[in-house]
Amino acid sequence: MLDYEKEAAGYDASRGGEPRARAAADTVLGMVPADAARLLDVGCGTATVTRRIVAARPDLQVIGADLAHGMARRAAARLPGRIVLADARRLPFPDGTFDAVISVWLLHLMPDATDARRVVAECARVLRPGGVYVTTVDKAAAHDVGSDIDAVLAARPRRPARDAAETVAAHAAEHGLRPAGQAAFPGLGQGRSPRGTIADLRRGWFTLLTPGDPRTERFAAGLARLPDQDRPRPDPRFTVRAFTRPRTG
């Protein structure tokens, strides 16, 4: 698991920067009702996506929440007065506070399945009837684009995806949310190169391959034999799911 306090300084540049943030914000906003008045961005990170939502929808009262102090500090510098330090598993808001709740690239980071379930439960709890929850799903799978890099890494150990689409849908249903749509967007600038993937392996980005593990070095050696070491392979394509809390009465 990465330390997001340390990651904060270089987070934007290492995650596709502004092009990816723009694509994410545009797609998420396309699933937020036009009459929404209050939106919560859970796990907002450095607010690269959040600030684009604010700029595109000045009618929305937008709040961002993140647990990592480093991330929240950077987010608050971009959106003063709109960022709170909060655990997504215990959101500090009353039931039914928001017309829309989003979580972009958050669920896959949860330590275990119970934590992911708690995040979805909290997002559902603070959503008003008729509101929409929008979240990314299947993030790890999005990076498998059928490239030679993916072929080398095919045998790597993997943990069960906390954000598997079917799992997230089941969590949502358990808390009264119904499917309300699906969309996708490209992870612009995030196509992997062999040399960059080797660096990511050695930094611990692949959860079950820790720095210094002999298996990590075997995969790194396989990547080092690939041609065009600095040529990015195709960009990933991220999937977004929307869920709504039905109106009652």
Stretches with model-predicted labels:
Residues 1-36, 48-52, 71, 132-161, ...:
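Conserved class I S-adenosyl-L-methionine
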Residues 38-42, 46-90:
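Class I SAM-dependent methyltransferase SAM/SAH-binding core
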Residues 117-129:
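A short glycine-rich, Lys/Arg-flanked "PGG" loop and its adjoining helix->strand segment in the class I
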Residues 160-176:
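Short alpha-helix
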Residues 178-249:
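Conserved Class I S-adenosyl-L-methionine
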Residues 100-114:
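A short SAM/SAH-binding and catalytic strip from SAM-dependent methyltransferases
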Residues 89-101:
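A short acidic, Gly/Pro-enriched loop at the edge of an enzyme's catalytic core
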